[in-house]
């Protein structure tokens, strides 16, 4: 089945997984984001191992009852296997590389709109008096030795201080304080690395 016209966002992606047998498990049982949440996923979704590469095509999970974060859900493992990604794109697993090449050759150009964006319905600013990342984001601490809670698929929008060119990159982001995140930048590997180097010089 071709899902490419159906999937518009995370919600519709999860709906496709709900309709695919064995690809999504949802729970309302309370879990602690401190090591417990990832521990449950390790056994349900990853077959009891975190060794790479995992050969188990276990289900993605959605936790609807995260301790300390009422009315917030956490999705984990949505892109954890090539087969699941292929299902979401409506292609065979072996065709993913070709699909990526096709998309790079014929990209969909962005549409600029001045209408209110759905993703901007709720906006939190660091200048808000009660702003606190620890309270706003149900980011899990995956092991007792982790540096802190991690947003594992965080998107970082950055702009070069000289050229004004911008880029969006995906990173694991560690919450360090109520208004600070840290990310690892490998020197020279991405545009954002050059942006950070230049910003550090200023």
Q: Model features per residue range: what roles?
A:
Residues 1-202:
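Extended, highly charged
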């Amino acid at each position: 089945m071709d899902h490419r016209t159906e999937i518009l966002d995370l919600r519709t992606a999860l709906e496709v997984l709900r309709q695919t047998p064995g690809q999504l498990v949802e729970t309302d049982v309370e879990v602690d984001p401190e090591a417990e949440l990832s521990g449950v996923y390790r056994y349900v979704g990853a077959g009891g191992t975190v060794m790479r590469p995992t050969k188990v095509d276990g289900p993605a999970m959605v936790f609807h009852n995260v301790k300390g974060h009422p009315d917030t859900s956490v999705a984990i493992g949505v892109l954890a296997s090539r087969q699941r990604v292929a299902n979401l794109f409506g292609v065979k697993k072996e065709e993913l590389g070709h699909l990526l090449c096709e998309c790079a050759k014929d990209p969909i150009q962005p549409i600029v709109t001045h209408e209110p964006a759905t993703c901007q319905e709720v906006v939190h600013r660091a200048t808000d008096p009660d702003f606190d990342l620890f309270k706003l984001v149900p980011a899990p601490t995956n092991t007792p030795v982790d540096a802190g809670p991690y947003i594992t698929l965080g998107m970082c929008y950055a702009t070069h201080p000289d050229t004004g060119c911008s880029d969006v990159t995906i990173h694991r982001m560690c919450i360090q304080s109520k208004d600070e995140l840290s990310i690892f930048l490998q020197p020279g590997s991405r545009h954002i690395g050059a942006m950070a180097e230049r910003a550090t010089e200023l």
